């Protein structure tokens, strides 16, 4: 491969950092009418200003810095410009990831675009992608622009800080999927926590501090077991490089120890039953962009980690303890599904729905069958599109217009916002896993893989289909119909803006198009998953 193509992966990490530097170092001002004045052009509109002031109050109640020149020209801090810069940077990164996808050879199950960087730190950094990580890279670069669009108008204070955190999260998330060293994987895996902590702590709702500490403590304590397992691997093999570890065949006793440590860390990140309190609080209290990144990408880190650390390196332990994973997954599905039926908070309902679907793709990948593993990846990607769209609708449209997340306040929204209701209906069907959506293909293949291994638990896991239909249809029916709309929302609920429509229709097209043509993803996955199953069997026999 040409040398200039090899730099694409490095560019994926550098472009957001360049965007961070531009936003941090540049003062964005817009020239307005001559001072004094009382009206401003869009997007500032009416302001309140006094003579000699160095700040003014915008129409939404926020304050903006003012610069007065000798000619009485006035410059006001432009909060839209840095948002545009961040959005352009994220779109540019999406274009680079699409180039990597186009140039990727899916008939080769080895790592490609491999880069070695010796001069960036005291530690050698290896970057590369294979037929599995390429899809998670694409998912990340797709979701970040959606997250930036979601809070376009609702974030009015500390805008630069918010944008810097979002671009920093993109860099760290991409690094997790690109590094070829398990120690660096752990470092970037944990480096995501401080930005999330600050994001929720600064821009969250009323209980944001409590939620930020929950997510930090839960995931940090869980990841200590992952660090212990990685250090054990390193001491045994003398390396932390992926390719070298793939040639290992750990003793069964060591495999059990490593499996327990790694699975605990990923069970917290998925999350599973008894370990999901942090996710619910984080989703409910997080700003909309944080919820979208959390549901769309962060929850997929455990799925990716299972493919990197458990399935190829610990085959015998993962095969022998499959039934325990299945039991945990089934209990999580049933618990989360019942919890959705009793909650009155829309955001909390979608958070519980995420826990239920995460349990389905968890048991799918641990089925150790080609269908189950491929289905688990498909369902993870589908959830990465559907869940952010639902959060966008309830947090970026309904909540921004009404100021409440309580379900019983909403009814008859279809009368005021038919386009919003139509897209809400499409994503509710996708969340149910109906045919012609990517969710259906992923859920069907995941459950099929479970049926092949343990039919009884597969039957219990299939209850997720019934439960997801129950809470998704209930939510849509209650919000879109359910009688005449409340007079409280008569003047506040309006239909989708162009920004909201473009973001939601883009995700909707992806979910439906890939549901009709899933071979676009499955053909690329098949070589890597088949190779994984083959090496799996060889190591199991040798062990």
Swiss-Prot record:
The keyword Protein biosynthesis does not apply. Belongs to the complex I subunit 4 family. GO terms for molecular function: NADH dehydrogenase (ubiquinone) activity; ubiquinone binding. Keywords: Electron transport, Membrane, Mitochondrion, NAD, Respiratory chain, Translocase, Transmembrane, Transmembrane helix, Transport, Ubiquinone. The chain crosses the membrane at residues 5-25, 84-104, 129-149, 161-181, 182-202, 213-233, 254-274, 287-307, 321-341, 350-370, 377-397, 416-436, 456-476, 501-521. It is found in: Mitochondrion membrane. This is NADH-ubiquinone oxidoreductase chain 4. Its EC number is 7.1.1.2. GO terms for biological process: aerobic respiration; ATP synthesis coupled electron transport; electron transport coupled proton transport. Disulfide bonds: none annotated. It comes from Neurospora crassa (strain ATCC 24698 / 74-OR23-1A / CBS 708.71 / DSM 1257 / FGSC 987). InterPro entries: NADH_Q_OxRdtase_chainM/4 (IPR010227), NADH_UbQ_OxRdtase (IPR003918), ND/Mrp_TM (IPR001750). Core subunit of the mitochondrial membrane respiratory chain NADH dehydrogenase (Complex I) that is believed to belong to the minimal assembly required for catalysis. Complex I functions in the transfer of electrons from NADH to the respiratory chain. The immediate electron acceptor for the enzyme is believed to be ubiquinone. It catalyses: a ubiquinone + NADH + 5 H(+)(in) = a ubiquinol + NAD(+) + 4 H(+)(out). It holds the Pfam family Proton_antipo_M. One of its GO terms (cellular component) is respiratory chain complex I. It is a multi-pass membrane protein. It is an enzyme of class 7 (translocase).
């Amino acid at each position: 491969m040409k040398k200039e193509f090899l730099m694409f992966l490095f560019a994926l990490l550098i472009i957001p950092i360049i965007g961070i530097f531009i936003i941090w170092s540049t003062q964005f001002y817009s020239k307005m009418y001559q001072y004094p004045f009382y009206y401003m052009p869009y997007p500032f509109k009416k302001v309140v200003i006094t003579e000699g002031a160095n700040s003014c109050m915008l129409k939404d109640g926020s304050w903006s810095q003012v610069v007065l020149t000798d000619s009485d020209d006035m410059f006001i801090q432009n909060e839209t410009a840095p948002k545009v810069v961040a959005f352009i940077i994220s779109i540019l990164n999406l274009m680079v990831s699409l180039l990597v996808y186009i140039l990727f050879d899916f008939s080769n199950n080895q790592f490609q675009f491999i880069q070695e960087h010796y001069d960036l730190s005291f530690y050698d950094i290896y970057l590369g992608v294979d037929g599995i990580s390429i899809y998670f890279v694409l998912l990340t670069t797709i979701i970040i622009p959606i997250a930036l669009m979601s809070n376009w108008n609702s974030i009015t204070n500390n805008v630069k800080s918010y944008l810097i955190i979002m671009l920093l999260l993109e860099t760290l998330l991409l690094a997790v999927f690109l590094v070829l060293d398990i120690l660096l994987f752990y470092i970037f895996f944990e480096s995501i926590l401080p930005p999330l902590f600050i994001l929720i702590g600064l821009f969250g709702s009323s209980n944001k501090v409590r939620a930020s500490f929950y997510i930090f403590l839960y995931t940090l304590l869980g990841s200590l077991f992952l660090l212990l397992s990685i250090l054990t691997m390193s001491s045994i093999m003398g390396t932390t490089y992926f390719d070298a570890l793939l040639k290992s065949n750990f003793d069964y006793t060591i495999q059990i120890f490593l499996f327990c440590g790694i699975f605990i860390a990923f069970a917290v990140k998925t999350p599973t039953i008894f370990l999901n309190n942090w996710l619910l609080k984080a989703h409910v209290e997080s700003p909309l962009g944080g919820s979208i990144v959390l549901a769309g990408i962060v929850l997929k880190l455990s799925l990716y980690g299972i493919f990197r650390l458990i399935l190829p390196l610990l085959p015998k332990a993962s095969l022998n303890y499959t039934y325990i994973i299945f039991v945990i997954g089934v209990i999580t599905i049933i618990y989360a599904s019942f919890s959705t039926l009793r909650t009155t908070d829309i955001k909390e309902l979608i958070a519980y729905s995420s826990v239920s679907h995460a349990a389905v793709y968890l048991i799918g990948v641990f089925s150790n069958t080609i269908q189950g593993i491929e289905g688990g990846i498909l369902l993870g990607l589908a959830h990465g599109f559907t869940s952010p769209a639902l959060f966008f609708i309830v947090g970026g449209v309904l909540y921004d217009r009404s100021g409440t997340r309580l379900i019983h306040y909403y009814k008859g929204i279809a009368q005021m916002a038919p386009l919003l209701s139509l897209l809400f209906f499409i994503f509710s069907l996708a969340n149910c896993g109906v045919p012609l959506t990517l969710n259906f293909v992923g859920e069907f293949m995941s459950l099929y893989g479970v049926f092949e291994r343990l039919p009884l638990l597969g039957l219990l896991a299939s209850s997720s289909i019934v439960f997801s239909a129950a809470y998704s249809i209930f939510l849509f029916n209650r919000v879109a119909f359910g009688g005449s709309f409340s007079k409280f929302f008569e003047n506040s609920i309006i239909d989708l803006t162009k920004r909201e429509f473009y973001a939601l229709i883009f995700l909707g097209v992806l979910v439906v198009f890939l549901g009709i043509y899933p071979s676009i993803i499955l053909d690329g996955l098949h070589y890597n998953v088949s190779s994984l199953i083959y090496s799996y069997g060889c190591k199991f026999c040798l062990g």
